[in-house]
UniProtKB/Swiss-Prot annotation:
Pathway: Mycotoxin biosynthesis. This is Cytochrome P450 monooxygenase iccF. GO terms for biological process: secondary metabolic process. It comes from Talaromyces variabilis (Penicillium variabile). Heme binds at residue 476. GO terms for cellular component: membrane. It holds the Pfam family p450. The chain crosses the membrane at residues 17-37. Belongs to the cytochrome P450 family.
Length: 536
C-alpha cells in the first residue's frame, strides 16, 4: 500500500481537496508550528530548510504541492542514498520521516511488536470514521487469508477470473470489427477491474451487479476523502472532520450491504456442508474462505452482515484502484513504446506461442510469459503507486536504530520508492520505459534447456530497488493473483483488439501528471480500440 497522497488518484473532485488543503495551510499553520510537537526523532534534518529548523517554510510546503518529484529526489540524493534519515513535507501539513536505504534490512527484521504495518495504515486510513470501526485495519485477518489460503487455491480461481475478464472487455471495449471506438481508459478500466476482482472475491453473479460495484467504488472514494481530510486536520479536530467527510463512504456501505445480503445469507447456509463433501460443490472465492475461517476463529463476526460486508469492502479497497491505475499506465506505456520496441508485435508473438496448445490458463503457463512479465514490471518500476513505500509505525518504547537514532513511540516512517526506482546508479536510462528491460536479462541468463533465469526480476519479486509491493515479510500477499490477472488481461486485449492512440496524441504517450507526491496518467487519457476479426 502507498502513502496518503496516493489516494488523490481516485478522487474525482480535485477542487474539493485543493480548497481544503489551502484552508488547512491557512488555519493550521501556526498550530503545527507552535502547538504540535514533532513526531520524528530530534536532530533529523528537514529537507530544504536551515540546520536546526523544526518546521517547514511556506516555500517548501508549496514545493511539495507543485514540484514534489524534484523535492523528494533532492532528499533522496542528499540524505537517504547516503545512509542518512531526513524529514520531508507530507500531505496537509504533515512531517514524513524517511529512513535511509541502509536501515531497510534492520527495519524488515524487527518484530511486529516493535514496528507495525497494520498500525501505520490504521493511522493513515482512519477507518474508525469511514467504516465505523478500527477492526478492518487493526485486525486484518481478511488480508492474512490471501497469504495463508487464497494463494494456495490460485489455480482454481484462474479460470473464473479469465472468463470474467472476457465478459467485461467484450462489454466495455465492444465487439465491432469494422469501426474504431474511442474510450476513456481509466473510466472503462475501473469497471473492468471491479468486475474481474469481484469474481474472485464474491463470485458470480454479484460481480456483475453494477449497483454493487458502483457502491463499492463510492465507499473507496469516501474512504480516501476521509483519510486525506482527517489526516490534514489537528488531532483535536479529527473527531469532527472524520464523521463529516465519511458520509459518502457510510451511505455507500449501506448500498453494498443491501446488494450483498442475499449472497451472504446463501453462503451461511453452505457452511452446513463440509467443504470436502463430494456431494457439495464448495464456492471458490475469497468470501467463502473468509466465512470458513470465521467459523473457527471469528465466531463473534460470522453472522454479522455489517462486519463481513466491510471486510469485503476492505479487500476491494486493496484490489481495485491500484490495479486499475497500473493497467491504465501499462496500456499507455505499451502504445508509447511500440514505435521503438515493436512492443505489441513482440507481446502477441509470445502470447500466441503460450496459448497455441489450446489448454486453459495455469500458473505455470503464465509464468513462462517473461516478456509480458517484463512489460508489467517495467510499468510498476517507472509508474509506482506512490513516491514512498514501506509505511511503518513505531509501537515499542525506546527503540533505537543501529546508528543510534532514537525512534519515538507512535512515530511513522517510510522509505523512498520512486527516487530509488529512477536512480541512474541502479537502472540504465531510468526514466525511459523499456518494455523488455528485464526479459532481455532473464533470457540472457537462460539455462541449457532454455529456461529463463533471473527469478529475482519477475513482477512479483521484491527488493530494496523495486518496491511497488513493499518488501520483506509484509510484502503485498495479493501480488501473485494480480500478476495472473494482468497477464491474462493483457493477453485478451492484445489477442482480440487492435489498439492505438487518438490522432491528436501524435503517437506519443500523454505525460504523467503530478498531484503532490503522486504521479498519475493524465485525467481523461484515451485510446482507440477495434475488435480483431480473428484473434491471434
Amino acid at each position: 500500500m502507498a502513502p496518503l497522497a496516493t489516494y488523490l488518484s481516485q478522487i474525482d473532485d480535485y477542487p474539493k481537496w485543493a480548497l481544503f488543503t489551502g484552508g488547512s495551510i491557512v488555519l493550521f499553520f501556526l498550530y503545527r508550528i507552535f502547538l504540535s510537537p514533532p513526531s520524528y526523532p530530534p536532530g533529523v534534518p528537514l529537507i530544504a530548510e536551515p540546520a536546526g529548523r523544526t518546521w517547514f517554510s511556506p516555500k517548501t510546503r508549496w514545493r511539495y504541492y507543485t514540484d514534489c518529484a524534484s523535492l523528494y529526489l533532492e532528499a533522496y540524493n542528499q540524505y537517504s542514498k547516503k545512509g542518512k534519515p531526513v524529514v520531508v513535507p507530507g500531505f496537509g501539513l504533515g512531517y514524513e520521516l524517511i529512513m535511509p536505504e541502509s536501515l531497510m534490512s534492520w527495519v524488515m527484521a524487527q518484530p511486529d511488536s516493535a514496528i507495525s504495518v497494520n498500525q501505520a495504515f490504521l493511522d493513515i486510513n482512519k477507518t474508525k470514521y469511514s467504516l465505523g470501526h478500527t477492526r478492518y485495519w487493526g485486525d486484518t485477518w481478511q488480508f492474512v487469508l490471501v497469504k495463508t489460503q487464497l494463494n494456495s487455491v490460485l489455480q482454481y480461481l484462474i479460470p473464473g477470473l479469465n472468463d470474467e475478464l472476457k465478459l467485461a472487455f467484450d462489454a466495455h471495449f465492444g465487439t465491432d470489427t469494422e469501426n474504431w471506438k474511442e474510450i476513456e481508459l481509466e473510466k472503462v478500466l475501473k469497471n473492468v477491474i471491479a468486475q474481474a476482482a469481484s469474481r474472485f472475491i464474491v463470485g458470480a453473479p454479484l460481480c456483475r451487479n453494477e449497483k454493487y460495484l458502483k457502491a463499492n467504488y463510492g465507499v473507496i472514494e469516501g474512504m480516501m476523502l476521509n483519510a486525506i481530510f482527517t489526516n490534514s486536520s489537528p488531532k483535536w479536530l479529527q473527531p469532527i472532520i472524520g464523521p463529516l467527510v465519511s458520509k459518502k463512504s457510510i451511505n455507500n456501505c449501506e448500498i453494498v450491504k443491501k446488494e450483498f445480503e442475499p449472497l451472504f445469507r446463501e453462503r451461511l447456509e453452505t457452511l452446513k456442508h463440509d467443504k470436502d463433501d463430494p456431494n457439495f460443490e464448495e464456492p471458490q472465492d475469497h468470501l467463502q474462505l473468509l466465512l470458513r475461517y470465521a467459523v473457527k476463529e471469528r465466531k463473534d463476526e460470522l453472522n454479522d452482515l455489517d462486519i463481513i460486508a466491510k471486510r469485503i469492502i476492505a479487500v476491494n479497497f486493496a484490489s481495485m484502484n491500484q490495479t486499475t491505475m497500473t493497467v491504465v499506465n501499462m496500456l499507455l506505456n505499451i502504445l508509447g513504446s511500440d514505435a521503438e520496441f515493436n512492443t505489441i508485435a513482440v507481446l502477441r508473438d509470445e502470447m500466441k506461442r503460450t496459448t497455441s496448445d489450446g489448454e486453459p490458463w495455469t500458473k505455470a503457463k503464465l509464468a513462462t510469459m517473461i516478456r509480458t512479465d517484463s512489460v508489467v514490471r517495467e510499468t510498476l518500476r517507472i509508474n509506482p503507486f506512490g513516491n514512498r513505500s514501506l509505511m511503518r509505525k513505531v509501537i515499542k518504547e525506546g527503540l533505537v536504530t543501529p546508528d543510534g537514532m532514537k525512534l519515538p513511540k507512535n512515530s511513522l516512517f517510510s522509505f523512498f520508492s520512486e527516487p530509488v526506482q529512477h536512480d541512474p546508479d541502479k537502472f540504465e536510462d531510468p526514466f525511459k520505459y523499456d518494455p523488455f528491460r528485464t526479459s532481455r536479462e532473464r533470457e540472457a541468463a537462460a539455462d541449457e534447456e532454455g529456461k529463463p533465469g533471473g527469478h529475482a526480476l519477475t513482477v512479483v519479486s521484491t527488493s530494496p530497488n523495486y518496491l511497488p509491493w513493499g518488501h520483506g515479510k509484509h510484502a503485498c500477499p495479493g501480488r501473485f493473483l494480480v500478476d495472473c490477472e494482468m497477464k491474462m488481461l493483457l493477453t485478451y486485449v492484445l489477442s482480440n483488439y487492435d489498439i492505438e492512440f487518438p490522432v491528436e496524441y501524435n503517437g506519443q504517450r500523454p505525460p504523467t501528471i503530478w498531484l503532490a507526491e503522486v504521479g498519475l496518467p493524465p485525467r481523461g487519457a484515451k485510446i482507440r480500440v477495434k475488435r480483431r476479426k480473428e484473434a491471434i
